[in-house]
Amino acid sequence: MGQKTNPNGLRLGIIRTWESQWYVNDKEIPNLIKEDFLIRKLINNFAKKSAISQIDIERLKEKNKNRITIFVHTAKPGVIIGKDGDTRNKLVVKLKELTQKEVNLNVLEVKNSDKIALLIAQNMAEQLENRMFFRRVQKMAIQKALKAGAKGVKTLISGRLGGAEIARSEGHAEGRVPLHTLRADIDYAAVEAHTTYGVLGIKVWIFHGEVLPGQTILDTRKPFASQSSNTPNRRPRNFKGGNNNHVNAKKN
């Protein structure tokens, strides 16, 4: 069922780790899950145009229960930090008001945003909302990701494509995206685009390479990371149709 499940969740505990790191009693788990959800929602709403790819939350020490450490991974750190750190300080104040706890906010820059699934999907959604043709949007996103060092890319857009009366799904794929291989580092994201014809669903899969014994997920995400010699090369790019790189299915 690798084709049906979320690739991020399927690989948790195998090659991926959790974005929330904390250990508490069973009674406290629901409250902290809700608190983490509200923290991420506040940060994303506060800095909508900062291209945030991931938000990590840590509560590691039992002695410091009232201390939360947050790591925000973004392609535009200057938007969150602001002039002399003013914007960051405002965000910290809002987080303290929300959680009633001490907050340590760290902003980390994402070096290569062209092969991060969430940022690619958000960029595609923005282009679709600006009425760019959906096939061109997919092809441009795939080309950028491959140039950035991705081993394989797959995209899928669903909805009233081009303003059609009947909703359908259409996608493109290039390179290898082995969803059934658990050691394969696959980044996945799903985003919605709100257009004049309705909501379009966008899904993006990025294959960074295989995490071999002795490696971590960071080794596969380096720019132009080397791949093992026994891994097949990706197939040539071809955007002129064909079953290998084109998916077209009616929505049930």
From Swiss-Prot:
Query: What superkingdom heads the lineage?
Result: Bacteria
UniProt region (Disordered), positions on chain: 222-252
Example GO CC term: the record gives: cytosolic small ribosomal subunit
* GO terms of molecular function: mRNA binding; rRNA binding; structural constituent of ribosome
SS bond partners: none
Q: Which Gene3D superfamilies match?
A: 3.30.300.20, Ribosomal protein S3, C-terminal domain (3.30.1140.32)
Keyword entries, A-Z: Ribonucleoprotein, Ribosomal protein, RNA-binding, rRNA-binding
Q: Name one GO biological process term.
A: translation
Where composition is biased (Polar residues), the residues are: 241-252
- The KH type-2 domain covers which part of the protein? 39-111
Spell out the Pfam families in the cross-references: KH_2, Ribosomal_S3_C
The similarity comment for this entry is: Belongs to the universal ribosomal protein uS3 family.
Functional note? Binds the lower part of the 30S subunit head. Binds mRNA in the 70S ribosome, positioning it for translation.
Please describe the quaternary structure of this protein.
Part of the 30S ribosomal subunit. Forms a tight complex with proteins S10 and S14.
This chain belongs to which protein, by name?
Answer: Small ribosomal subunit protein uS3
Q: What is the species listed in this Swiss-Prot or TrEMBL entry?
A: Phytoplasma sp. (strain STRAWB2)
